[in-house]
Amino acid sequence: MNTKLKPFHFVLLILTLVFFSVATKVRASQDTSQPPKSLASEILVLSQNMEVGLEIEARSPNTSWARKGAEAVAVLISVDGKYNQDLLLWAGDEWFRYRVMLGRILKGKHTVSVTLNTPRSAAAARSAEVKSLRSLLFTASPDAANASEEQLAVAYSPFLYARANTIDRFTDIPLLTYYEVLREANNDLVVRYTTVFTNEDGGTQTAALMARWGRATDIEWVYQIRLHGGKIIEETYQGVEHETKFFTGPRTAGNHPLLAVASENNNFSDLACSAVRFAPFPFRARLETATRESVMDLYPQTYRVMAEELIREKRISDAPADINTIADPREYLYIEATSEQEGAALAFDVKVNGQFKSFASDMGEPRLRIDRSGYFRTAVRLPRDISPADVETITARCHANQKPASERRCNRVNVVRALMLDQGYVPRVLPLQTQPESSLGPDEIRVYRVGSQQ
């Protein structure tokens, strides 16, 4: 998301990262009077070099991402006694299968251990349970030319240093990492990695996130490789202020790039580091006809922890009064649509049974309309206790915007999905009238019927 970080602030942030790295290491050393509690371990016997992931089914009793001081237990993952990464059990009391990337491990016998990391855990979060460990093994290809798309994606997935001012604060943590495989016109192959964070402490305000993006998590592309003729010709990442930069930083566990979260809106640096690092295991997402937000639908817990962080940070209210506050995310209708904008922007109105007025995604604010093209989401706040069966219509409306343009139209408009979150934060898709794409001029509308009455 857009935010400004001046060069001085960036230098200060890097210095802060170094300071926190030293400070947190000192703190950890002060808490070693008792050996860390082992939760689980697994012996790996590899007949060849492998890229290894780990699935950990775990829970942390009596914790909640919403409760200050009891947010989560941290566990430390090591390979042959050496630090690999930390993992925060952000799903709390619920059993959840966390997947992490360990990196390339050489042929032979190895021990993977998961231990309680008390210094990194919340003050009132002191226990964790591990039901199972499962290794995820991928043959390590000797070079990019002979690797499959999956082998490439696994071998180059990034490890992320935590932003220093998030350590022990349980904010803006990475939840999921996915990758896309893109084939471009010049026959280049691009593998791009994107991470879903719980939220962003800087950048777009919460209500604007919901209106323009249909979520309050932060979703950022992190890193990508470009291949031509089977050879990697370029590695880039998203730098501070959304600048695309060439990756020249260090690597770990094979070819995995080390990047640090380096700004309040979760952009990255290949120079900084901190005392804590994460490596969510990447899964493939096919988003040619879907939004980035749709990956969250596969893991409903991400909606819950999104809401819990907002609750803890006092950004959820029964009566939102400013741009940084929203209602309970379960009180919104989430609309997934597609359009190609030319000097125009889209907004949506929702009509519900028994309500005289419609409810608008832009809340009457032109800056909350959607002016980007492609597939996108928005979220429309509805009255409390409205059920999916109460939703009658969704109206798309096109508006001219202030950007220079030879023509002003919303082209190829279509609403493709509508959903609401149930009480357990599970997305429930609403029946939606199927319509062909349409083009709208300024002030023109298109109505889509919702529900069984269509």
Regions found by a protein language model. Give the residues of each.
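Boundary at the C-terminal end of the N-terminal hydrophobic targeting segment
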Residues: 26-30
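Bacterial N-terminal signal peptides that target proteins for export
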Residues: 2-12
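Structural beta-strand segments of beta-rich domains
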Residues: 50-54, 331-333
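Generic short beta-strand segments
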Residues: 56-61, 115-119, 192-207
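A short, structured loop/turn motif at beta-sheet edges
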Residues: 46-49, 78-82, 103-110, 182-189, ...
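Bacterial N-terminal signal peptides
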Residues: 11-21
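Domain-length functional cores that host ligand/cofactor binding and catalytic or interaction surfaces
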Residues: 141-151, 183-190, 196-207, 211-221, ...
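Beta-strand-rich ligand-recognition modules
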Residues: 31, 35-45, 57-138, 356-391, ...
